């Protein structure tokens, strides 16, 4: 029998039958519907545990279009199976996934031909301190978290979204490692674009049962 992770966490970890965010979502349902219903949505890094959870939380508010980009081809396939097989889950008719990086030329082509999206959420990043294991890993970390992120922000400026969300980390607060510093730089860059489009970012701590975490 396959483990239902949601039920396992509720029964053995949080001991809550209902999400602690359920009341907030319900109290703001009208606002969320107004912001999301009928809007086009782009999710980068949507095959990961946090990105896919975001998608499942947003879909009940009925966006008109969902495009998901991730380098994990199997993860995208699993996401699609999960969405299609979940009873009562709304999936827009215009739902597409692409196995590529947001820094790839083909991504830029997709973005420009779509003329942008109403809502853009980016969950793609090097997120582990162990990404600093050698000089090549550090270069890749900075390239992804900062240099590619800057190019992406410039691309967003061509067709500004109504709302842009980007995930960060608690390690960006008074950073003591390169990964945290790279995310702090990313945060500062994002905030420099607030005059062009609405920006929100959130600092995550370690998320139990997420991909790559010790408890998973």
Q: How would you describe each model-predicted region?
A:
Residues 40-61:
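N-terminal Rossmann NAD(P)H-binding glycine-rich loop of SDR-like oxidoreductase domains
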Residues 1-40:
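Non-catalytic terminal and boundary segments that flank Rossmann-like NAD(P)-dependent oxidoreductase
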Residues 72, 82, 170:
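Residues in the short beta-alpha loop(s) of Rossmann-like NAD(P)-binding domains
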Residues 63-64, 159-163, 197:
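A short helix->loop->beta-strand "cap" motif at the edges of active sites that frequently abuts
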Residues 95-97, 141, 164, 199-202:
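Hydrophobic/aromatic anchor residues within beta-strands of the central parallel beta-sheet
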Residues 74, 105, 172-182, 194-216:
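Flexible, glycine-rich beta-alpha linker
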Residues 57-68, 84, 90-91, 100-143:
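NAD(P)H-binding glycine-rich loop region in Rossmannoid oxidoreductase-like domains
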Residues 122, 126-143, 147-187, 192, ...:
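Conserved Rossmann-fold NAD(P)-dependent oxidoreductase catalytic core, especially the SDR/UDP-sugar
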């Amino acid at each position: 029998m396959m483990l239902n992770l949601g039920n396992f966490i509720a029964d053995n970890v949080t001991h809550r039958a209902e999400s602690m965010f359920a009341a907030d979502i319900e109290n703001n349902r009208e606002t969320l519907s107004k912001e999301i219903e009928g809007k086009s949505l782009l999710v980068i890094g949507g095959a990961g545990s946090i990105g896919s959870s975001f998608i499942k939380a947003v879909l009940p508010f009925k966006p008109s279009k969902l495009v998901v980009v991730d380098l994990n081809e199997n993860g995208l396939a699993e996401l699609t199976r999960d969405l299609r097989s979940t009873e009562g889950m709304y999936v827009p008719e215009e739902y597409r996934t692409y196995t590529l990086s947001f820094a790839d030329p083909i991504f830029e082509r997709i973005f420009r031909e779509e003329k942008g999206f109403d809502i853009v959420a980016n969950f793609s990043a090097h997120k582990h301190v162990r990404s600093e294991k050698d000089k090549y890993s550090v270069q890749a970390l900075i390239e992804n978290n900062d240099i590619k992120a800057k190019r992406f922000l410039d691309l967003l400026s061509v067709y500004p979204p109504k709302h842009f969300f980007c995930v960060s980390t608690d390690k960006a607060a008074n950073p003591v490692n390169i990964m945290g510093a790279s995310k702090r730089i990313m945060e500062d860059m994002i905030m420099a674009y607030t005059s062009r489009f609405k920006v929100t970012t959130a600092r995550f701590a370690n998320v139990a049962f997420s991909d790559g975490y010790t408890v998973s």
